[in-house]
Amino acid sequence: MLEITGLTRSYGAHLAIEGVNLHVDDGELVTIVGPSGCGKSTLLRCIAGLLRPTGGQVVLDGTPVTGVPDGLAVVFQDYSRSLYPWMSVAGNVALPLRARRGDREKPGRAARRAAALAALESVGLADTAGKYAWQLSGGMQQRVAIARALACDPVLLLMDEPFGSVDAQTREDLEDLLLRVRAERDITILLVTHDIDESVYTGDRVVVLTRGPGRVRAELTVDLPGPRDQISTRELREFARLRGEVSRLVRERAPDATGRAAG
């Protein structure tokens, strides 16, 4: 599905990520965590084709990524800036279908509306189609942003801190929504988050990056029984163990080539 090899990106003299290697299988939900400034968002933007890497390669379904690939969708943290206030909720969700690129056939108006309504249904917002984004709560607006990504029927969904701007209860609701949508659509998801609990709760695998420049420090398999829920899953001993291990890896500086802690 997704193969990242030796990915490096610099901004002038500043090296953001260096030598990142990562493989993601079809249908997998992989979470990425790391210290602030470690290049998590830069990595995601390189994968999405929004940034050209300084070195290395991203391959999606056997094709090198040299621009924004067809079959990929991105959900960002700042949902308020990504939704047009003068368009209806359904219009916002259908908008990317009007600009579809690549080999996929561009759907007609009726097909676009049907896809938008189906996507809104999948995130529990079927009754908001005729409303405007500014009439919705922050959590509902982020659901609209997720629906817009799903309407494109992507093979890969990239999410950059998508729940970072909502309250704790809404965040948990959106985490559960993500797990449900993933199960229903069998979609591959790469989720960047600063929340360690979220990375373990939602992920099949947690990728921990080092302090900048970001490199892959560790990959932890999350083997928790399903279906997961916010109470019983978080009370499991294995959840606590994984959470502690990820937290330790994020806090501690990675050893350098001599085996000593860098910095």
Set out the residue ranges of the language-model regions:
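The feature captures the beta-strand-to-loop junction immediately N-terminal to the Walker
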Residues: 33-35
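Helix-to-loop junction immediately C-terminal to a conserved catalytic motif
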Residues: 48
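Conserved ABC transporter NBD signature motif
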Residues: 56-68
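Conserved ABC ATPase "signature" region
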Residues: 101, 107-128, 180
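Conserved ABC ATPase signature
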Residues: 132-136, 140
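A short, proline-enriched helix->beta-strand linker immediately N-terminal to the Walker B motif
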Residues: 151-155
